[in-house]
Amino acid sequence: MPRITDEYVIHQRKVRPNIDASHRCAFRCPQCIRQKTISQDQIRRSFDLSEENFQKIFDYYTEGITFCGQISDPIYHPNFLNLLKICNGQRKRVRIATVGSGKSDAWWDEAYSYGVGENAWYFGVDGIDEKSELYRVGSNFQDVWKRMRQGRDLGQLIVWQYIIFGYNEHEIDRAIEIAKEEDFSLLLINTNRGFNPNNRLLRSNVDFQLTSPDKKHTQERVKKELWAHKSSRLLEWYRLGRRD
C-alpha cells in the first residue's frame, strides 16, 4: 500500500510551479511589491537563477512551469533565452508573464523561436492605448504592442492581460473587439490591491496615478481573472497539458 507521502510527491510533480528567476525589473508598477519599503531587503538578497538549477526544476515537474516574477520581470534575467532553450521541444506548458518592453527585435526573434505551441506569453497591457503606462510605469505601449504582434506572427500564443482600473474600465468592450481582430486571448483582472497613494508602505518615489474602478471590478482578497476572449491557440495550449 503506497504511503500518503508517496502520493503527495507524485502529485507535486504534476503541478506547474511559479519561478521568480531573478531580482531584475525595469518598471515601477505602483501596486507591485517592488514599490513597497518592506521588499527592499528581499530584492537585495535575491540573485539570478542558474541554468543548472533551472534544468533540475524543469526536469522534475512533468507538466511545465510558469515564469511570473513577484520581484522581477522574467525577460530581464540575463540568460533568459537560455532558459527558454532548455524548455524548448519538451511538450510541457510554459507560461511567461511580462511587461514586454525594452528588448531588441533580435532578442524577441530568438525568444519566439523557442516553444512554439508550448509557450504562452502573457503581456501586461492595462488598456487599449498609452494609458497602460499609468500602471506599467517605464514601459512603452507601442513597443509592447509591436512585440505582441511579432509573437503572434511567429506562431506564439499571445495573452493580453488587462488589469481593470478606473481609467480603462469603459474600454473593455473595445478591448474585446481588438483582441478578436488581433487574434490575442484577453484576460481581464479584477485586482485586490489597494488604491491609497498615501500608503505608508509605498516607497517615496512611487508615481501613483491610479484610479479605482467600479466596485464590481475590485476584489477584497484574491484577485479574480475572467477570460473575455480565448483564441484557438489558447485552447490548443490547454490540450497540450492533457496527458493520456
Walk through the language-model features, giving the residues of each.
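A C-terminal junction/extension of Radical SAM enzymes
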Residues: 1-12, 155-159, 168-181, 185-244
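A glycine-centered beta->alpha junction motif in the catalytic cores
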Residues: 125-129
